[in-house]
Each structure stands twice: as structure tokens, then as C-alpha cells.
Amino acid sequence: MTARGWEDFSNLLDTYEALGLKADEALIRQYIQHEKIAEDFSAYLDLYYKYRDDYGVEEILAGQARPAVFARLLNAPFDERLSLVSLLLSGLNNRFTASRRADAAADACYAFLREAKQGFATLPDDIPDGPATLFNQMMTDYDAETRRQREAGLLSRDALATRLKVYAVLRQWEAELRRAKAAGTQEAFDLLRTQFQSLSDERDAAQEAAASALEAAFDFMEQAFAESQEMVVFVTELTLAPAAHAFITENGCPRYFQYNKDLLLDHRKAALQQELAAEERRHGGM
């Protein structure tokens, strides 16, 4: 499968999950031609769906873990416990990604709004529908640039998603401009600024959803695993995942920083003990 094929397949799986649907082996075979790999991937997905539903991952990330979950974990094998940790990380990563995309879209729309303000300043107030017409032309140029970059292969998956989101928002703003029939450029800009506030609120909501889920995940991890190997894996993966690292760096998470610090100290302590043991062996052999 090509890189583009994997991207399309990943997008499809994300869409299925958002709709509450499950991808079966027949669907997987449309993207993965190798029979054994398709079977293995299908088996992995089945296990993923099973643990996700059995443990109620979304409930855990909402801070509403069922008591039965903790009872089941007491007798669960290590690989099953790690699978649950992986599912929690996947759910968090989806929220971190959504927050990052909402942030990127808001930033891009803000930059577009500033350009529109500069353009409006050059328009005489007596031109009928002038702001809406200019805004439409700016939108057309933005869409054309997106198409050009996409065809040239210059856009990453995230960059393309952001530009498509921005264009969808701009179309809504243009519709509001035409509906309001703003009499002047200042009135038109004030309307757009009000529209931007809704987008800013959407960004704040995505950030809050991710932060809340992260806190709920730590609550669950502490109650279910304390400072065991599962917690080590959880914190380590948060450190290694780009979306998680970026979100935590920007928004903070005291418990993450504390656990990460403790893990670093434990690592240094273990390394020192190994050095001391090696030194003792060298002296013992003299």
C-alpha cells in the first residue's frame, strides 16, 4: 500500500469510529491486498473494538469509569492491561489532534480576518455589496491555493485538514455577510469579528475537552495501576507521541510532569546502580 493509500485508509477508519461503525475484513481487504496481513490487521481491530467496548474507554476518559472495570483488571493478564493503556492513549491522541486542528484553524482564520480588514479599508463605503464581493474573491484565491498545493503534494494530512476546515468556515462567514447586507465596511468587519468569536469558543472547547480527558485518564491510571509498569508505559507514550507532547507543553499537566520527573530519576538511579555493580565486578575480578 502506498503512503497515500495508508492515509486514505486511516481517514476511513477515523470516520467509521466517529460514526460508531466497525471496519470488517472485507473492507480492510480493499486497502490491504496481502491476505495474511489483512487477516492479522482485522484480528487486531476486533481485539481493539472488544477491549474498547468492554472497558468503556470513552466513559473512562469522561471520568465515569465503571466499578466493574477495576474488578476485571485485578485478574487481567499483562497484555490486556497494556491494551487498555493503548486504547486510553489513542482516545487522548484523538482529542489532542482535534485541539491542535481547532487551534490551527482559528489561527488561520484570524490571519484571514486581518487580511480582510486591510482589504475592506481600500473599499469606498458606497459600493453595494463591496465587502461580500471582496471577501468572496479572497475565498476563491484561498481555495485555488489549496488546490495548487494539494496537487503539488505540498500539504501534509494536518495541513490539508486545516485548510479545508478554514475554507468551510469562510463560506459560512460569507453567507452571513450576504445575509446581513452590511451597509459599510466597518459593519461588515464587526460581523466577521463576531463570527470569529464562535470559532475561538470552539477552539477553547476542544482544548478543555482534551485537558479534561487527560486528567480523567490520570485519575483512572492512578486508581487502577498506581505506579506500576502500566503507568510507566502511559507516561512514556505521552512523552513520545508528538500530539500529546505538543499539547502538554502548551497547556501543562502537573501530574504528567511529576510522573515524568519521577521516571527520569528512577532511570538515573537504575543506571547508577548498574555502574556501581559493574565497578564492583571489576574490582572483584582483580
Region annotations inferred by a language model:
Residues 1-141:
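Alpha-helical lid/collar subdomain of P-loop NTPases
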Residues 86-286:
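Charge-biased C-terminal accessory regions appended to nucleic-acid-, cytoskeletal NTPase
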